[in-house]
Amino acid sequence: MSNKKADSKPQSRYPVNLLDTPFPMRGDLPKREPQWVKEWQERKVYETIRAASKGRKKFILHDGPPYANGDIHLGHAVNKILKDMIVKARNLAGFDAVYVPGWDCHGMPIEIQIEKQFGKSLPAAEVMQKARAYATEQIEKQKVGFRRLGVLGDWDNPYKTMNFTNEAGEIRALAKIMEKGYVFRGLKPVNWCFDCGSALAEAEVEYKDKTDPTIDVLFSFAEPEKTAQAFGLNALPRNEGGIVIWTTTPWTIPANQALNLHPEIVYALVDTSRGLLILAQERVEACLKQYGLEGTIVATTPGAKLVNLRFNHPLASAHPSYKRTSPVYLGDYVTTESGTGVVHSSPAYGVEDFVSCKAHGMSDSDIINPVMGDGRYIESLALFGGLSIWAANPQIVEALQGAGTLMRTENYTHSYMHCWRHKTPIIYRATSQWFAGMDVKPNDTDRTLRETALEGIENTAFYPAWGKQRLFSMIANRPDWTLSRQRQWGVPMAFFVHKETGELHPRTLELLEEVAQRVEKAGIEAWQSLDPRELLGDEANMYEKNRDTLDVWFDSGTTHWHVLRGSHKDELQFPADLYLEGSDQHRGWFHSSLLTASMLDGRPPYNALLTHGFTVDGEGRKMSKSLGNGIDPHEVANRLGAEIIRLWIASTDYSGELAISEEILKRVTEGYRRIRNTLRFLLANLSDFDFAQHARPVEDWLEIDRYAVALSANLQNDILSHYEKYEFHPVVAKLQTFCSEDLGGFYLDVLKDRLYTTAADSVARRAAQTALYHIAHGLLRLMAPFLSFTAEEAWKIFEPNSETIFTETYHAFPAVPEAGALLDKWTLLRAARSDVTKALEEARVANLIGSSLQAEVEIRASGARYDALTSLGDDLKFVLITSAASVVKVDSEAEEGVEVIASKYLKCERCWHYRADVGANAEHPTLCGRCFSNLFGNGETRSAA
């Protein structure tokens, strides 16, 4: 290390070994960090790490790609820094831990941006061109933000889902799952956003409160004789009345095609002034009260007896086109928790309705589907044609009132599906889409996709463990995956479909490979510009190009295929060791990646999943613009330093919500300063130490040095076990405790006298420095994953010839003989020292002494404490930082205690100890004998401290 002594202070006649270091007390992080970012970039530090790690066992943390749109926010910072800490910790643990960042580039948000800037009438080719340019610009902006946070990775060669190689890889992945038999086309209700004009993935749906009119509606008897028989009656007392349903979606009434009852629920035939009403028996009292009616139950029967009975559509008298009947089907999903116990079924607009009607033989062509993709009814729909469904709600209520079939209406606030992009309500809408079948058995295994995925979850490690059940439940209960989207900026489902039959071309798999080869050279634009005749020849007139694009979750969900084993196969590998994202990704990237890998490989693409929580303010509130409680990581980095953000993340239990506020950041900053001060002390007191020249073997060390190194080695083992389990907050807590209590509050405090006052090249001082050298080596490496800037800054002073701390591995501490016994002994000694410190403080408050060195102490001790204290001999006073110390043996703990007296001797000018031999040498009347020996003689001898 460079020897930089403090030359600004006047030289004392009796100098001490007070050294300095270029490592400043003030971090000045906002100024210094960008310099390190620049240096790491210019010196290609990431590439240096890769070269140093070559040949080691790989550790692959596969980056879940953020979307290439907008500035990075605090959630991005949490995610990327957690990944960075893990990758750095694994590199230091001796792995070749590669980090290739990625970006998700296709999809609606970018397409919306292009529409906003250039309108909706751009030709497809221009949309593609501008979308690529926009995504590239956003990626470069985000890249700068991530680098500023100290995240090291292959920033010059990231993966992008819009790279031609990756787009082609997705098409090949699609071909593979088609070849295995997972993909089918069908009419099904899917999440549909009117603003997107497209189907949505489950992960693109969020729930917010919405107020709608609820209605109780009467479907009048169409088969009174059969109804009477079902209730065990010869005839109905009268034919007026019918069955009553309750719904929160009046707009679905025009498309009603069935009624659902639970087979085991008991239904009552109730005589009222509005006629005979069929209601679930459990709901009769509540419903009649709501309708303002009184009634008598005439008969009861289980739902199973009412199956296939028919009732008239409630708008039959309002317009002839509604003169149809709705049959009763049975459904286990019907409950009596609310409503009437009868569910009206519009198969085009409900998954359960659809499944029920299909199970009872309804064909796709029979399904009534009057709502268009923009949310308006088709013009030909009687009474409501051309209206948006939301605008039609009150008109439908009015029409039912006029038809005499409205029993009741009121406004109802409920949690309802919304598009996560547009924040507008969405619906289930039956459309012809391409699906991956969850319960399809492919042609290469007898297990369904659902079964394969669930088995994969069982074989995956989860951090924290609760993530397992969450993902398991989602997979167990999810519907088929809607793969297709109706947009432009996305990877095409590059099929040729027969114009008359709708069938795929018989050479579809071969054609997909042909398209993939073109896309690999020219991007997805190659499909847009492709003339079918190029691939189909004379058959081209019979086929049309499928216009659907792949769900963007298929883009990112297949990165294990087109990145790990595609664009970056030389750096990465399959399966990844770890996927790490926020808890929302159980229904997002974790989910889609599991499904695609289960289809392609029969196993998950990851060995472990790590989930982190979301950021909240100091009061636990979600951050939002309306509350004004958002914190910008860029602003914090420029004001306090990215290191403070990193330390905050590392010190917070990420398995729950991560709370942040100015007060929290203030506490983190104070903690950072304590760590920095510890490093400064270590570096300053090692600035005249050259390991090759000055290091002393363990047998030359004083006992307290051996203890400190054994304690450091124990700490390292403890911390490495936490790193192994991706637990960072215990690492920070233990390092901070070590710095403030074990080092600052004890070892370094005791060491100052030896470092400053013994001869510069004495065995005692060099032994202390050797211990400090090992402690510094260990400490810097242990903190490097989270305090990356600070560790690198200190490292370049500590080991100036080393390229970077990140090519190192964790320090190999020298073995300390009988370390366990030593640790136990010094635990006793430190407890005794705490008692002495307390007694000294009481003496100071009583004005008996000033500093602790003005004191002489007598300790009464018994048993093991007595043995430990007396074993230190004359060095005990150094451990206690007093001028003298003696130990008196007593028989029991009850008799133990500490007596403090003020020393009657003079104070040494140099070491500040009060000693009888101060002035013993006439030529140096202000020196004690110890300092005289250290300066002019052979030096004092120490054994313990």
From Swiss-Prot:
Keywords: Aminoacyl-tRNA synthetase, ATP-binding, Cytoplasm, Ligase, Metal-binding, Nucleotide-binding, Protein biosynthesis, Zinc. Pfam families: Anticodon_1, tRNA-synt_1, zf-FPG_IleRS. Its cofactor is Zn(2+). A motif ('HIGH' region) lies at residues 66-76. GO terms for molecular function: aminoacyl-tRNA deacylase activity; ATP binding; isoleucine-tRNA ligase activity; tRNA binding; zinc ion binding. Binds 1 zinc ion per subunit. InterPro entries: aa-tRNA-synth_I_CS, aa-tRNA-synth_Ia, Anticodon_Ile_BEm, Ile-tRNA-ligase, Ile-tRNA-ligase_type1, Ile-tRNA_ligase, M/V/L/I-tRNA-synth_anticd-bd, Rossmann-like_a/b/a_fold. L-isoleucyl-5'-AMP binds at E581. Zn(2+) binds at C908, C911, C928, C931. GO terms for cellular component: cytosol. A motif ('KMSKS' region) lies at residues 622-626. ATP binds at K625. One of its GO terms (biological process) is isoleucyl-tRNA aminoacylation. The keyword DNA-binding does not apply. Its main location: cytoplasm. It is found in: Cytoplasm. It comes from the Bacteria. It catalyses: tRNA(Ile) + L-isoleucine + ATP = L-isoleucyl-tRNA(Ile) + AMP + diphosphate. Its EC number is 6.1.1.5. Catalyzes the attachment of isoleucine to tRNA(Ile). As IleRS can inadvertently accommodate and process structurally similar amino acids such as valine, to avoid such errors it has two additional distinct tRNA(Ile)-dependent editing activities. One activity is designated as 'pretransfer' editing and involves the hydrolysis of activated Val-AMP. The other activity is designated 'posttransfer' editing and involves deacylation of mischarged Val-tRNA(Ile). Belongs to the class-I aminoacyl-tRNA synthetase family. IleS type 1 subfamily. Monomer. IleRS has two distinct active sites: one for aminoacylation and one for editing. The misactivated valine is translocated from the active site to the editing site, which sterically excludes the correctly activated isoleucine. The single editing site contains two valyl binding pockets, one specific for each substrate (Val-AMP or Val-tRNA(Ile)). This is Isoleucine--tRNA ligase. The gene is ileS.
